[in-house]
Amino acid sequence: VMLAYTFSNLSSALMSNLGLIVFTYTFGLGSGRIALVVGVQFLFAILSQKPWAALSARRGKRYALAAGFIMSVAGGLYFCALVLLRDRVGDSPLAFMPFSVLAGSGIGALFTLPLAMVADTVDLDEAAGGERIEGTYFGALTFAYKFSQAAALVLIGLALDLAGFDSSLAAQGRGTVLALGLLLGLGASVSFGAAALVLRGYGLDEAAVQANRARIRALRGGGE
């Protein structure tokens, strides 16, 4: 869970930070249109919470979170297509709506499911007769989040250098804007894909979660 959380937060940080540069220089979007694209993305991140909760209850948290990551990968690949077709896309915000819906909904799974999966791991420890160490687990998630944000800043700096970005110029070269757009789309897709792959190591399904909770109730009842 920690590795998946790191990779997915890295992708999210790339989209939110490098994305503003790409929207401005690659597509020529103004601040109002950028706000619309990003606003729709956040809206679907919020609206997706109930569907993700329903899917996790039916198929398990790992399945739901992996589905969210795959949606984000699809959003990143669609973004790459927009970059390649940027001359046709222009600065129309409507062309970005599928990206906003896919990426926003996918990132929505990141908001709650990893935390719930860590809580299930804490229950597993207690059910096995161990101690509850919530502080250790959630502290590790906090570290993973901060590490991913710091790593994103380093990667963005490298991407800008590799693409030949010059902040003193009002307009960047065609090769530069193409490279920045593809680095963002492909980089985010690869990172979300890696997050989905490492989730394969998480073995708690909903049946195991319910069994652990029943075991905990029995242990606590016996100690009273």
Q: Where are the language model's segments positioned?
A:
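Membrane-embedded alpha-helical bundles of multi-pass transporters/translocases
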Residues: 1-224
